[in-house]
Curated annotation (Swiss-Prot):
Any one of the GO CC terms: cytoplasmic vesicle membrane
Organism: Mus musculus
Keywords from the named record: Cytoplasmic vesicle, Glycoprotein, Membrane, Repeat, Transmembrane, Transmembrane helix, Transport
Known role: Aquaporins form homotetrameric transmembrane channels, with each monomer independently mediating water transport across the plasma membrane along its osmotic gradient. Unlike classical aquaporins, AQP6 is an intracellular channel with selective anion permeability, particularly for nitrate, and exhibits very low water permeability. It may also facilitate the transport of gases, such as CO2 and NH4(+), as demonstrated in vitro.
Species classification: Eukaryota, Metazoa, Chordata, Craniata, Vertebrata
Primary localisation category: membrane
Ranges per topology, Extracellular: 44-51, 119-138, 186-189, 203-210
Annotated protein name in UniProt: Aquaporin-6
Domain remark from Swiss-Prot or TrEMBL: Aquaporins contain two tandem repeats each containing three membrane-spanning domains and a pore-forming loop with the signature motif Asn-Pro-Ala (NPA).
Residues with glycosylation annotation: 134
Membrane topology term: Multi-pass membrane protein
Catalyzed reaction equations: nitrate(in) = nitrate(out); iodide(out) = iodide(in); bromide(in) = bromide(out); chloride(in) = chloride(out)
Intramembrane segments of this protein: 76-85, 190-202
Length: 293
């Protein structure tokens, strides 16, 4: 074998897995911090019970922090509903979406476990688990979560779409989360994020009506993705391109172009880079097959 071929392939594999691991860790960390701070704001301290405004502001700030931390690394999903919306809109591949959701659920569980560990016993019993309040029926609860998540995902797409804005999306997405909490707390405690509901439920073992906080948000996310990507701001992807993105055989899988105004010379230099060695071609083919490239 020609000297240097496999060394270049090794570097390519290392770079690939570094990028993948960074994105997954960003989703894990962002979701964990979101759950720790957000759910921490709803704990029933006897000295002073949290107000709806306090909870909404805390979730606002937690969201903005999570987004700012991860948006240039993973796209700042931190929410299985957002990831599903991106999948439906043909912005990420199925393998990447599955990996993101796994990282988000793990991060949410870790964040809830940390919160549980640092909270006194009498206060951590329910750990902010989402439940239905004020005689709200299960059907009404699903509908509320659907609408709340729909507005959130629409805001996520609009805030992170490079065709619309180049600014950081953290503040606007945080505001959308706060809006949902100002209304949704009275109905369901406001989830809009299956991972937020999943983490605390796992730690305290309370899964009553837990399905609501998957069905409602995921349905709302799908509807929001269809509205944004096919009605409000449709793109020009063909069916073949969408299928290629779904299975991960193309790199065109982002709605967000973090640096859409790169110099033309940089683009040209990237376009002229060729992988000529057998090892490099094999690694590139492997990464496309996984849909993680």
């Amino acid at each position: 074998m020609e000297p240097g071929l496999c060394s270049r392939a090794y570097l390519l594999v290392g770079g690939l897995w570094t990028a993948i691991s960074k994105a997954l860790f960003a989703e894990f960390l962002a979701t964990g911090l979101y759950v720790f701070f957000g759910v921490g704001s709803v704990l029933p301290w006897p000295v002073a019970l949290p107000s709806v405004l306090q909870i909404a502001i805390t979730f606002n700030l937690a969201t903005a922090t999570a987004v700012q931390i991860s948006w240039k690394t993973s796209g700042a999903h931190a929410n299985p509903a957002v990831t599903l919306a991106y999948l439906v809109g043909s912005h990420i591949s199925l393998p990447r979406a599955m990996a993101y959701i796994a990282a988000q659920l793990a991060g949410a569980t870790a964040g809830a476990a940390l919160l549980y560990g640092v909270t006194p016993g009498g206060i951590r019993e329910t750990l902010g688990v989402n439940v239905v309040h004020n005689s709200t029926s299960t059907g009404q609860a699903v509908a509320v979560e659907l609408v709340l998540t729909l507005q959130l995902v629409l805001c996520v797409f609009a805030s992170m779409d490079g065709r619309q804005t180049l600014a950081s999306p953290a503040a606007m997405i945080g505001t959308s989360v706060a809006l949902g909490h100002l209304i949704g707390i009275y109905f369901t405690g406001c989830s809009m994020n299956p991972a937020r509901s999943f983490g605390p439920a796992v730690i305290v073992g309370k899964f009553a009506v837990h399905w609501i906080f998957w069905v409602g948000p995921l349905t709302g996310a799908v509807l929001a993705s269809l509205i944004y990507n096919f009605i409000l701001f449709p793109d020009t992807k063909t069916v073949a391109q969408r299928l290629a993105i779904l299975v991960g055989t193309t790199k065109v899988e982002k709605v967000v172009d973090l640096e859409p105004q790169k110099k033309e010379s940089q683009t040209n230099s990237e376009d002229t880079e060729c992988l000529t060695s057998p090892c490099e071609e094999a690694v590139r083919s492997f990464s496309f097959t996984l849909g993680l490239c």
